[in-house]
Each structure stands twice: as structure tokens, then as C-alpha cells.
Amino acid sequence: QADTIVILTECQFEKNGYQNRFNHENKWYTMRINQSLRPIKDKLYLEPIEDWRKITTAFPKLDRLNVSIQPRLDAMNSSIIRSAAQILGIRTEIQYDFPTKLTSTARLVEICKHHNATHYLSGISGRNYMDLKLFEDAQIDVVFQDENTLSKKSLIQIL
């Protein structure tokens, strides 16, 4: 459980990641996006209305999300996250990150400090790339969550 969820927008878009697509029953569903190398906050969808219509046609339950179709990746994802949280009764505060020259783990530590965090929740793979000493020096405990032990239900199945 978290007190605050911070949506990262001031970081690099991850090609072939989950920021603009999802996998359901071994099939990928994608919101097409411009291919420029820009931060997430500057990424634009090519055809957001058309792509969202295709997804909601395949998964009518997603109509419950009451999503505001947005041209920017960060705004659209924020709309989906906030709507899903409301439907699921999740009342955790949702914030955006902020511009900083820091990168990688130093950025995460700075965000945690900004929110007076005592703990940082990470996926288990964070062990492979985070500099845990930076968290230790800031007196922030890192809690690794093994995704394999979490529910495998997708948002579509939960709705």
C-alpha cells in the first residue's frame, strides 16, 4: 500500500514497454505514438480517438473508465489511472514528478525526499539497476515487490 503514487513524465519513453500498450491473453493492444526520442510528457498519440475506440470495442468493460481522450501520452495514462483508481476505490494521492537534472536512482530518491517518503516500492527487477546506497544514505527503505506473487488479473478482468 502506498500513500502517494508518483507518475513519472520527466523520463525517457521506453520503446516496447507498457506506456502505450498492454498484453491481454497473448495479444498486444497499442495506442500508436510518435517515434521521436522525447520524454514521456512530450509524446503524442497518432490517432488517440481511433485507437481508444478499437480497444474499447475489443474490451467494452473499459468504457466504465470514463477516460478523457488526450493527445499526450502522460495525460491519457493519467486519465486511465485516475479513473481506474476511482472505480476500484483506491484513494491514494496521485502526483506527477517534477523537472530535475538528476537521472536514474538519484531522481527517484529526490522524488521520495520531496514527498517525505520513508519507503519506496519497487518491482523485483529494480535490484538489477538501482543504486540502493543512495536510498540508504537518504534513510529511505526500498521494498521490492515480486510481481510473480501478485494477482495476475488485468484491469480488464477486474472491471
Regions found by a protein language model. Name each.
Residues 1-159:
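Residues lining hydrophobic/aromatic ligand-binding pockets adjacent to catalytic sites
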